[in-house]
UniProtKB/Swiss-Prot annotation:
This is Codanin-1. Residues 193-213 are annotated as: Interaction with ASF1A/B. It holds the Pfam family Codanin-1_C. The modification Phosphothreonine is found at residue 70. Keywords: Acetylation, Cytoplasm, Membrane, Nucleus, Phosphoprotein, Transmembrane, Transmembrane helix. PANTHER family: CODANIN-1. Residues 77-88, 95-116, 138-179 have a biased composition (Low complexity). It is a multi-pass membrane protein. The chain crosses the membrane at residues 317-337, 631-651. It comes from the Eukaryota. Disruption phenotype: Embryonic lethal; embryos die before 7.5 days of gestation. The gene is Cdan1.
Length: 1239
């Protein structure tokens, strides 16, 4: 694989062709000549991507990055990185490596070696040792841990075949002054003292002047970049203050230098040193430590062309989903962007490789300038993904001074994306729900075997909530332990649940409480038996948004465990996890698995929104937002249930390490392969992919598999599931935006969760890099049907960050760079700007809304749950009806006013007309201010309708006081819902409706505008005796002899006696014409419905698909009757319809396909209709040609396709032929003259 990379660096093979060669098992014809140089390396093709990732990690070994070390799940190519002699093989599985491998120890006289990593290794293996980042408490902290030497993971030193790393010497003289390797006699080793909690020295922070947007701003809670405090722990931080500093010491650097000397001197005299202290003048090269950021300069970039080429290769692999984790690579790139310094290497090493820039022996990153340049190049290729990140991350990227210096164009694009983004991700966790109420339909006496079992269940339910309340009160105390405090009570409670029915009832209670408490993001919230009061609303602060941001930063977890955190149970989920562990009940676990499986199947099959509302459906905006919220609730519930199902199902098999021997592993595999899965996830996954519901199925399935043990991925059943997921991952290419494919954010969510799954420690490292032939049997398509969830934008940034909180690590990494300090918790510092409290309490009127909410909550707490549901239902429907009422009354009146004003302007201007845009702006400026009446009318509507609805739905026996309170609460909730929507959307709604009316009138304006204006209403002689449109539509929908029945008779199977007479068709069209000419009661919706039905009738007439009543020999309409009916329809379209008629449907594949079922096929009516449409200016030649072109692209039977092509050529060549009669046999003749003669 090193040869492949060198060929790319020497530009012997184009990058695009090489990426296609890597991504496909069979190269295409156009790539065969370009990748001929790589044909000999085809067996090693799958190893190129892991080699490239490890190569980049090795090249960045001397970089001191910002933030924690990041894992890379990449097996090492054995061809490029041979195994160390004597190291045992591990079945072909690669080893684990850090994104930033070990830094090289410097000279003994100048630098102290890095501290060895405290985390354990999985064992020897070929290539760099790989370790999982952020694994709970076991992960090493940034400030106190360095890296092990490069040869500690089994890699050969430089000169033995490991490319890219600096040359290391094994014969360096020992550093006798290093107190870590050579401590003084009689002292305690540093490791024991390092476990004591050190005191923290507070460094003074100088106040700097305000900086521009492109420079990071400092606050008083974090030091500036130039004064980063040392992250080396020390228990002697307070002692040097008594040593007396000289009065002339004015520099912080001098002060630190003296403190180092004092610590070194005192440490040599003290019997218990805290940590190794380097000698004076030799700073410890920690990750950020006490090193200031080195400025990056684009002019000092070395090997610019080489870096651009490697960045292009790397970005192409990311774009084609050839890397396991997209966001892990972005985190690595941002670490390069925010790297502070590089550990210096020997000058001889760099000089020896100056001549071969295209060789892998030459370091890729020689300086910070190279790192930043490479990172910016990759970010430019990944801008599409960056633009979908949250608003805070975009702001930090746009303000990064290095990015501005290296690529002002990218910085401008990021700033534009930030200004246009509305993706504000909130981390505030809503309070948890109350306790599960009594369920009379399932928890009554009739569902238990005896009175004793019933009373035992009620008692155990009370014990369960006592345990939950005690956990809530004490779980945040450091000295409190769940098992010691609650374990015995839980096991005693489970022992009394002896009957199976008692277990099933308790499991149902357990599951419902789990969903109520943990369904919110993070799963943490307020009290169990009642929501905590909203303190912020009670304060009534002037800047409530600032206080909410402060609340968000205080209660949100600071870090999710790095970009690849292990599966955990945050917040309230920890209680349920510990409860299951302490119960240790096989009966309870089995009932719980059954209940969770059933609920997952139920939610996974739930019918969810399948379409996105269009621009014309303004009234359904609120309903669409509600449907998106419903999808989010269902998805989060599925992920929560699947997480606990996986935890319980794989709990008996989970262990820290895989089986030690191959024989033991084979025996376990043979045994486990006979055990059926607890849930048929393979069938559910295949159903989700076929139904285009992967965006709902895959996230919860990933949660289930994340708790699998080491044996699960080796079982054939689960191996096929992982292979199917891998195929799906490779098909989710973000750059493909074809029509009908999966939405971008839907793809991004799936890529994020799948990438996280592939980094789980129990998933084999080589699983992601399977050969294409091993996954060809599982074909996956991302082209979504019109009825699939995948094509609907149901995922937004809030849901993306809720399901994948580790994406927020990108923002925390950039924020730590701005703050200038890595801190002690992984390099992330949260800046909090304090808000003054002088105005708190000065606005008593602003607390009324909060008091009303508390009073309503107290009222519902003392009433049955059905009362709350009734009031909320009434408020929801009355609010929605209010919006529709405002649109039908106020907005409709304003539209009529706009039409009248437009008529006056058209009459006054005559033939001159005017600019439509100016007319629209003029009308909107006059009418939009009247939208303020919507709030007043909305309040009146809610006050008038809500009490009536509440009284109708509540029982008659409801007390008057309760009824009155419920009515008032319903009025308030409905008014708040309606007014909030109207205040935000009424102006846009008025503009949209006025624009539609203006466009419709301008299209209808002809050479005689006065006549057109007069024709919009009824004629003066109209007596309004025409059939009402509502009656006509009712007949179309329900009456047995109606136009809809005609269409139904023609469309489906029917009895021989069913049919319609030509006289009835003429009568029905005459009634339609009367209704269209009498405009008094005709609304646009009814007119659109009639227009669509008339077009469908014309299509059936052309295809001769209407059954006719009469003798048995006559089943088709005569040509004369059909032409007369088509003439009537053309007249209606031309003279009577004033709205748009969807004439394009006449040439849709569905309607033209009706001719395929006719034997013999006759095309004269279609030719006649097309010619008349052109002559009456109802459709243009170009429009018909476009429709015909789309028809030719459709899939037809062979003979039908030839007839269509011949007919279209005749129409386009001879558009004015007099009524030709063409049959199918005539269209198949090759000679056009014969066809015309027979016509």
């Amino acid at each position: 694989m090193a040869a492949v990379l060198e060929s790319l660096l020497r530009e012997e093979v184009p990058v695009a062709a090489a990426v296609r060669w890597i991504a496909r098992s069979t190269p295409s014809s156009e790539d065969s000549s370009e990748v001929a140089a790589l044909s000999a390396l085809r067996p090693l093709r799958k190893e190129f991507v892991p080699f490239l990732l490890n190569f980049l990690r090795e090249q960045s070994s001397r970089v001191l990055p910002q933030g924690p070390s990041t894992p890379a799940k990449t097996p090492v190519a054995s061809a490029a990185l041979p195994a160390r002699q004597g190291a045992p093989a591990r079945g072909g599985r690669g080893a684990r490596s850090q994104l930033f491998p070990a830094a090289e120890p410097l000279s003994a006289a100048a630098e102290a070696p890095l501290a060895r990593r405290a985390g354990r290794r999985r064992g020897p293996g070929p290539g760099p040792s790989r370790e999982r980042g952020g694994r709970g408490s076991g992960a090493a902290e940034e400030g106190a841990s360095g890296e092990s030497p490069p040869w500690a993971g089994g890699r050969k030193p430089k000169g033995s075949g490991s490319p890219g790393s600096p040359r290391l010497s094994l014969s360096d003289p020992p550093n006798l002054s290093n107190l870590e390797e050579f401590p003084p006699v009689g002292t305690v080793p540093p490791g024991s003292a390092g476990r004591t909690k050190p005191s923290r020295r507070i460094n003074p922070t100088p106040v700097s002047e305000e900086r521009s947007l492109s420079k990071p701003k400092t606050c008083f809670t974090s030091p500036p970049i130039s004064c980063v405090p040392s992250s080396q722990p020390s228990t002697l931080d307070t002692s040097p203050w008594g040593l007396g500093l000289p009065p002339g010491c004015r520099s912080l650097q001098e002060e630190r230098e003296m403190l180092r000397k004092a610590r070194t001197k005192q440490l040599q005299q003290s019997p218990t040193p805290a940590s190794p202290i380097p000698e004076s003048g030799s700073p410890v090269p920690s990750r950020t430590g006490n090193l200031t950021a080195e400025p990056a300069d684009p002019a000092r970039v070395s090997s610019r062309q080489r870096l651009e080429l490697v960045a292009l290769i790397y970005s192409s692999c990311i774009a084609e989903n050839l890397v396991p984790n997209l966001f892990l690579e972005l985190f690595f790139v941002l670490q390069l962007l925010t790297a502070r310094r590089m550990v210096a290497t020997k000058d001889s090493d760099l000089e020896s490789s100056q001549g071969a820039l295209d060789s892998l022996d030459t370091p890729l990153f020689r300086s910070i300038h190279d790192c930043v340049f490479f990172a910016v190049q990759v970010l430019e290729h990944q801008f599409q993904v960056l633009s979908y990140l949250d608003k805070g991350t975009l702001k930090l990227l746009a303000e990064n001074e290095r990015l501005l210096c290296f690529s002002p164009a990218l910085q401008g694009r990021l700033r534009a994306a930030y200004e246009g983004s509305v993706a504000k991700v909130s981390l505030v966790i809503p309070p948890s729900a109350q306790a599960v109420s009594f369920q009379p339909e399932t928890d009554n006496r009739a569902n238990f075997s005896s009175d004793r079992a019933f009373h035992t269940f009620k008692k155990q339910r009370d014990v369960f909530y006592e345990v939950l309340r005690e956990w809530e009160d004490h779980h945040e105390e450091p000295s409190w332990d769940f098992e010691k405090g609650l374990g015995s009570r839980i096991r005693a409670m489970m022992g009394q649940l002896s009957a199976a029915c008692s277990h099933s009832h308790f499991v149902r209670l357990f599951q419902k409480q789990l969903l109520q408490m943990c369904q919110s993001p993070g799963g943490a919230g307020g009290s169990v038996l009642g929501e905590a009061p909203d303190v912020l609303n009670m304060l009534g602060a002037d800047k409530l948004g600032r206080l909410r941001q402060l609340q968000e930063r205080l209660i949100a977890p600071q870090s999710s465990g790095g970009p690849c955190p292990p599966p955990t149970f945050p917040g309230c989920q920890g209680f349920f996890r510990d409860f299951i562990m302490s119960a240790s009940s096989f009966h309870f676990n089995q009932h719980l698995m059954d209940s969770l499986s059933l609920k997952i199947r139920e939610l996974n099959g739930l019918r969810l929104p399948q379409h996105e509302p269009g621009d014309e459906d303004g009234e359904s905006d609120m309903d669409w937002q509600g449907e998106r919220r419903q999808f989010a609730v269902v998805l989060l519930s599925l992920r929560l249930l699947a997480k606990f199902l996986g935890f319980v199902a794989f709990l008996p098999y989970r262990g820290h390490e895989p089986p030690p021997t191959r024989e033991l592993q084979d025996s376990i595999l043979a045994l486990r392969s006979q055990v059926p899965p607890v849930l048929d996830i393979r069938a559910l996954l295949q159903q989700g992919l076929w139904a285009r519901r992967a965006v709902l199925t895959v996230p919860w399935l990933v949660e289930f598999l994340s708790f699998a043990d080491h044996i699960v991925p080796l079982l054939d059943y689960y191996r096929s599931v992982f292979t199917l997921l891998l195929r799906l991952h490779r098909s989710l290419v973000l750059s493909k935006e074809n029509e009908g494919e999966m939405c971008f954010l839907n793809k991004l969510l799936l890529l994020a969760v799948l990438g996280w799954l592939f980094q789980i420690p129990t998933v084999p490292e080589d699983l992601f890099f399977l050969e294409d032939g091993q996954v060809d049997a599982f074909e996956v398509t991302t082209t979504a049907s019109e009825h699939g969830l995948d094509s609907v934008p149901v995922v937004d940034q809030q849901l993306l960050y809720t399901c994948c909180p580790y994406i927020g690590e990108l923002r925390k990494l950039l924020a730590s760079w701005v703050s200038g300090s890595s801190g002690r918790s992984g390099g992330f510092v949260r800046k909090i700007t304090p808000t003054t409290t002088s105005s708190l309490g000065a606005l008593p009127l602003q607390t009324s809304q909060g008091l009303q909410a508390q009073l309503a909550e107290a009222f519902f707490h003392n009433q049955p749950p059905s009362l709350r549901r009734t009031v909320e239902f009434v408020a929801e429907r009355i609010g929605s009806n209010c919006v529709k009422h405002i649109k039908a009354t106020l907005v409709a009146d304003l539209v009529h006013q706009a039409e009248s004003l437009l008529q006056e302007q058209l009459v006054a201007r005559g033939q001159e007309g005017g600019d439509p845009a100016q007319l629209l702006e003029s009308l909107c400026s006059q009418l939009c201010p009247h939208g303020a009446q919507a709030l007043t009318q909305g309040r009146e509507f809610c006050q008038r309708k809500s009490p009536t609805a509440v009284r109708a739905l509540l029982p008659e026996e409801t007390p008057a006081a309760v009824l009155s309170s419920a009515e008032n609460i319903a009025v308030g909730l409905a008014t708040e819902k309606a007014c909030s929507w109207l205040s935000a959307n009424i102006t846009a709604l008025i503009r949209r409706e006025v624009k539609a009316a203006v466009s419709r009138m301008l299209r209808a304006q002809g050479p005689e505008p006065t006549a057109r204006v007069e024709r919009r209403g009824c004629s003066r002689a109209c007596e309004h005796h025409a059939p009402l449109p509502s009656h006509l539509i009712s007949e179309i929908k329900f009456h047995h002899c109606s136009l809809q029945d005609v269409l139904s008779l023609a469309a489906g199977p029917r009895d021989p006696e069913e049919g319609v007479s030509p006289e009835h068709l003429e009568q029905l069209l005459n009634q339609m014409g009367q209704s269209l000419r009498c405009r008094q009661f005709l609304c646009p919706t009814a007119e659109q419905h009639l227009a669509k039905c008339s077009v469908e009738l014309a299509s059936l007439l052309v295809a001769d698909q209407i059954p006719i009543l009469g003798p048995p020999t006559q089943h088709r309409l005569e040509r004369g009757h059909a032409r007369r009916l088509l003439h009537m329809l053309l007249s209606l379209w031309k003279d009577d319809f004033q709205g748009p008629v969807p004439l394009q449907l006449l040439l849709s594949p569905r309607n033209v396909g009706l001719l395929a079922d006719t034997r013999p096929r006759e095309w004269d009516l279609l030719l006649f209709l097309l010619r008349e449409l052109v002559e009456k200016d109802l459709m243009g030649h170009l429009e018909i040609e476009a429709c015909l072109g789309r028809l030719n692209e459709a899939q037809w039977p062979g003979d039908f396709s030839e007839e269509l092509s011949t007919l279209f050529r005749l129409f386009l060549a001879e558009p004015h032929l007099l009524e030709p009669q063409l049959r199918a046999c005539e269209l198949m003749q090759p000679n056009r003259g014969t066809v015309l003669a027979q016509s």
